[in-house]
Design a protein with these regions (language model features):
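Short, Lys/Arg-rich, polar N-terminal cytosolic tail immediately upstream
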Residues: 1-19
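A structural signal for multi-pass alpha-helical bundles of membrane permease subunits
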Residues: 16-305
Length: 305
């Protein structure tokens, strides 16, 4: 019988390590299963459906393999002139909404960072509140603001009875205003984080050299904050392409809603139940988002270097 204490200690450590590994696998396994069931499988199945003729509403399709039709859904989407109008409308929304969020968010962050005054922390907290609200609630709230009869928006601006929710000339701008109001604080927070991380000695050295405010802004502030601004731009661009709940709260799903891709995808997939067509449109949107964000990520990697 071997009573070597070192060998016993090594055996105990090996057993304990094996036990910890087993426990780790037991705890991680349910998460992996849920990830596969809730994400990977729907992603794969929707890709299969995009190459088929299938409607989830037809009870005759239940348990039946979908009829494969190749790239017909994709060809139909890309050859539809109305679909290109929706692409253009979505691009307008993204450019307007994200552009205003970046400008306003960074501008407010600059003011809060440079100007010292009593109650700045309280004001910052108030400015953050919109992004903590549910998007559907934000949409309904702005729908009440936009009401042409009793809404406060037209009353405060003295614009008369403009219907920002149903008028096709204004409903897109109505959604832009609500989205900018809600998500400008997100850009502001990231900008404040970037501005706070700029070393103070750089500004002190610039002061000694009697550098102008523009030199300090363009050569010190912007290069240091630029990576975080790109992060904000990436996240907001992705979310703007997929916007749905704010639009639903403001305009509903009817014909009065702005002709955005996300709203059309909802109507196709869950109102008319053209499941395969909706899946193909969803993957086209996914490719667009990946392509655009890849460009931003490329610039982000350059900025880090």
């Amino acid at each position: 019988m071997n009573n070597n204490p070192r060998k016993k200690r090594a055996e105990n450590m090996a057993y304990r390590s094996m036990k910890d590994t087993t426990l780790l696998r037991i705890f991680v396994l349910p998460v992996i299963i849920l990830l596969i069931v809730m994400n990977v499988f729907p992603l794969f199945w929707s890709l299969v459906l995009s190459f088929s003729d299938y409607s989830a509403k037809k009870t005759t399709n239940w348990g039946v393999n979908p009829e494969m039709i190749g790239t017909e859904n994709y060809s139909q989407i890309l050859s539809d002139p109305k679909m290109w109008n929706r692409f253009i409308t979505t691009a307008k929304f993204v450019l307007l909404s994200v552009g205003l969020q970046m400008i306003l968010g960074f501008g407010i962050a600059l003011l809060l960072h440079q100007v010292k005054f009593f109650g700045k922390g309280f004001l910052t907290t108030l400015l953050i509140l919109p992004m903590t609200m549910s998007p559907v609630i934000v949409g309904i709230m702005w729908k009440l603001f936009y009401n042409p009869n009793y809404g406060m928006f037209n009353m405060l601006l003295g614009l008369g009875k403009i219907d920002w929710t149903t008028d096709p000339n204004f409903n897109l701008f109505g959604v832009v205003i609500a989205d900018v109001w809600m998500w400008t604080p997100f850009v502001m927070l990231l900008s404040i984080a970037g501005l706070s991380a700029v070393p103070q000695y750089l500004y002190e050295a610039a002061e000694i050299d009697r550098a102008s405010w523009w030199y300090k802004f363009s050569r010190i502030t912007m290069p240091m904050v630029y990576p975080l601004l790109l992060v904000a731009l990436i996240f907001r661009t992705m979310e703007a392409f997929k916007i749905f709940d704010v639009v639903m709260g403001i305009t509903g799903r009817g014909t009065t809603a702005p002709q955005l891709l996300s709203m059309y995808l909802y109507n196709v997939g869950f109102v008319t139940w053209q499941t395969s067509y909706g899946s193909a449109l969803g993957y086209i949107m996914l490719i667009m988002i990946i392509a655009i964000t890849s460009i931003f990520i490329k610039y982000l990697n350059r900025a880090k270097q």
